Amino acid sequence: KVGVAMGDLCAGLYGVIAIQAALAMRERTGRGQHVDIALLDTMLAMLANQNLNFLVSGEVPTRLGSAHPNIVPYQVFAVSDGHIMLAVGNDGQFAKVCALLGMPALAKDPRYATNAARVVYREQLVKLLGDVLRTRGRDALLAELEAQGVPAGPINNIDQVFADPQVRHRKMQLQLDVGDGTT
């Protein structure tokens, strides 16, 4: 389970989108709209990849944690000083990751050369990559991945989140006067 009530949050967002669409329709046509948002419907929509996989194949998907069901490697990996999310979206990016990790032959191995093959051999590939990634430091590795155009990011704890330069730039943490002289 994730730490927050995702159904409530996502239903609220869907509700706002639906209200905006209804207001736009009213502006264009003069007619109102009925907005119907249900938590169940919202959470079902959040299972987009798993739903489609099931509806197309008839196979019940297994739990994959942070891993993408259709793209490999696309999940959280442990590194020597934390964790990263690695989101390798295509075969070219996979070849770059393999070269960067000193495993260029892996990208030519028929078991891993295409995403379709990597999905079949997910378990073996994730172990191979994980063994190497655990030896690498997070920040240096992320810089190398970024330089190669491979999507990846840090998994931060909450103090790291609020120390992040982008979070600070976006002013996501507000200082509030609580009335007793403290913030």
Which stretches of residues belong to each language-model region?
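Active-site-adjacent "lid/gating" segments in soluble enzymes
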Residues: 1-84, 88-89
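Alpha-helical scaffold segments in soluble metabolic enzymes
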Residues: 15-22, 50, 96-100, 128, ...
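A generic structural signal for secondary-structure junctions
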Residues: 24, 48, 52, 99-102, ...
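Alpha-helix/helix-capping structural signal
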Residues: 42, 92, 156-159
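Short secondary-structure capping/turn micro-motifs that flank functional sites
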Residues: 43, 114, 161-162
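Aromatic-enriched alpha-helical interface/lid elements that frame and gate functional surfaces
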Residues: 72-148, 152, 165
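A glycine-rich dinucleotide-binding beta-alpha-beta segment and adjacent secondary-structure elements
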Residues: 147-183
